């Protein structure tokens, strides 16, 4: 079979053009990891381009991709410098109160028949932050009937035993995290809480005139739980979604990220269906609670509550988790190839 010089030249020209185009495409095609990171960062912007979730995007979209490996041995536990670590407790809404530090939150939902507490700080913090904080707010710690522990890391479950033993509060936690508590060797220097209420998906905790709907969202820990409930702002009802666990400080492999991402997407749908306009959690640097609540003293009539960010912003919070989680997942896949 004869191939004319023209045909050969044309074929070579087409090959050269195609190769050049392919190379150009390779050079200009967006990096999928960076695309997800960019989408996560873009989702952090709030009203007037104010980055209302800057702390969240910094923690999970920047640090995880660049952070050094964790040391084999954990740092020793230390009683914190209370003068700098503990913040004044605040009345956040008509019936929701905040206590905590610049990085950790405990929330108290008041009802007709007592208090539902969300998360309990660390072992060394609970007495001062929770017991002392409730008293400063004019609330009685003995009226805490339920403690919902979003996940069993030491800075959320540390005060559960105190509330259980001293005040008889019922402790609610996911099954996987009760197992974590039971199996812990040295995570509870003052003793562990006794296994109590095991959270199930869709469970409702009702006290007086309030109900908290609980949802399983494994990922951050095996038994992480989130919640949906109602509060009031100057008499106006608002729906709150409580994000139970955010950071990627679990085993960094693809299956764990698949679990995390599935939970984020499910819980985002639950929040949207509930019409939630307030998103809070146990890490005050992620929802901005510690800073935002300081502005309440200067809030003017008709001005929006700093934590009532709107349904679109609540969706953006979950988008940050989703996009940044996908970025790290893709990086893990690339490393395994």
Where are these regions (language model features)?
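Sec/Tat signal peptide C-region and signal peptidase I cleavage site
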Residues: 19-23
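Divalent metal-coordination and catalytic microenvironments
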Residues: 95, 109, 119, 151, ...
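Active-site environment of divalent metal-dependent phosphoester hydrolases
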Residues: 125, 152-158, 178-181, 222-225, ...
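Accessory terminal helices/loops
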Residues: 24-79, 234, 245-337
């Amino acid at each position: 079979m004869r191939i004319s010089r023209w045909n050969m030249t044309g074929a070579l020209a087409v090959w050269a053009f195609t190769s050049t185009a392919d190379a150009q495409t390779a050079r200009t095609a967006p990096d999928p990891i960076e695309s997800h990171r960019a989408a996560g960062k873009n989702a952090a912007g709030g009203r007037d381009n104010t980055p209302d979730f800057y702390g969240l995007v910094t923690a999970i979209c920047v640090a995880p991709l660049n952070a050094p490996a964790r040391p084999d041995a954990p740092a020793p536990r230390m009683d914190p410098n209370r003068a700098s670590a503990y913040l004044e407790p605040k009345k956040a809404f008509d019936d929701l109160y905040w206590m905590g530090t610049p990085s950790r939150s405990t929330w108290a939902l008041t009802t007709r028949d007592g208090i539902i507490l969300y998360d309990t700080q660390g072992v060394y913090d609970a007495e001062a932050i929770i017991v002392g904080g409730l008293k400063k707010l004019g609330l009685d710690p003995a009226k805490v009937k339920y403690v919902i522990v979003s996940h069993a890391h030491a800075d959320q479950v540390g005060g559960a035993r105190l509330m259980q033993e001293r005040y008889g509060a019922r402790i609610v936690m996911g099954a996987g995290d009760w197992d974590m508590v039971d199996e812990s060797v040295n995570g509870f220097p003052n003793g562990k809480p006794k296994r109590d209420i095991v959270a199930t998906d869709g469970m409702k905790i009702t006290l007086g005139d309030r109900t908290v709907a609980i949802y399983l969202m494994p990922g951050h820990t095996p038994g992480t739980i989130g919640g949906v409930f109602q509060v009031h702002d100057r008499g106006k009802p608002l729906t709150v979604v409580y994000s139970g666990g955010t950071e990627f400080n679990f085993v960094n492999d693809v299956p764990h990220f698949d679990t995390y991402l599935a939970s984020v997407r499910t819980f985002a749908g639950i929040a949207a269906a509930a019409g939630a306009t307030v998103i809070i959690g146990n890490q005050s640097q992620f929802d901005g609670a510690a800073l935002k609540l300081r502005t309440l003293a200067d809030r003017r009539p008709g001005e929006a509550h700093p934590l009532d960010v709107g349904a679109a912003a609540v969706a953006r919070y979950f988008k940050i988790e989703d996009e940044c989680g996908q970025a790290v997942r893709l990086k893990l896949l690339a490393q395994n190839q």
